[in-house]
Regions:
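N-terminal alpha/beta PP-like core and its mobile active-site loop of ThDP/TPP-dependent enzymes
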Residues: 1-146
Length: 146
């Protein structure tokens, strides 16, 4: 049965399922709460961590042990920057990890706040692939490419 209001959160969950993701590790935050709610309703198993670095390292562990992508889900700004150590380790070891970070509204990107960070640029040197989704229609493709 098709959902009446298919949201970006629904698309993320469907893409995770289609890529055999069993677990998502992360910390709720204002920019991603809608996705946490959707995961609790109909997603891979959600495991809340106490720090974003733990989420990245737990995702790496899943990737290493199963060969399936481990997923870390965090909010924008400091949430994303706290992933870097775990992502550097996963990248250097060749472990499959998908990091999903929230982002502020587009009109807030140029404001000087701790949440308004260029996430894709920040993670470019820590990962094999880093992108920011500008168009919801490309969300599934970007996630699958990662």
């Amino acid at each position: 049965m098709a959902k009446e209001n298919y949201s970006a959160a629904d698309m993320v969950i469907d893409t995770l399922k289609n890529n055999n993701v069993d677990y998502v590790f992360g910390i709720p935050g204002a920019k991603i709460d809608y996705l946490f709610d959707a995961l609790e309703d109909d997603g891979p198993e959600l495991i809340v961590t106490r720090h974003e670095q733990n989420a990245a390292m737990m995702a790496q562990g899943v990737g290493r042990l199963t060969g399936k992508p481990g997923v870390a889900l965090v909010t924008s700004g400091p949430g994303v920057s706290n992933l870097t150590t775990g992502l550097l380790t996963a990248t250097s070891e060749g472990d499959p990890v998908l990091a999903i970070g929230g982002q502020v509204k587009r009109n807030d990107l140029l404001r000087l706040t701790h949440q308004a960070v260029d996430n894709a640029a920040l993670l470019k040197s820590s990962t094999k692939y880093s992108a920011e989704v500008q168009d919801p229609e490309s969300l599934s493709e970007v996630m699958t490419n990662a």
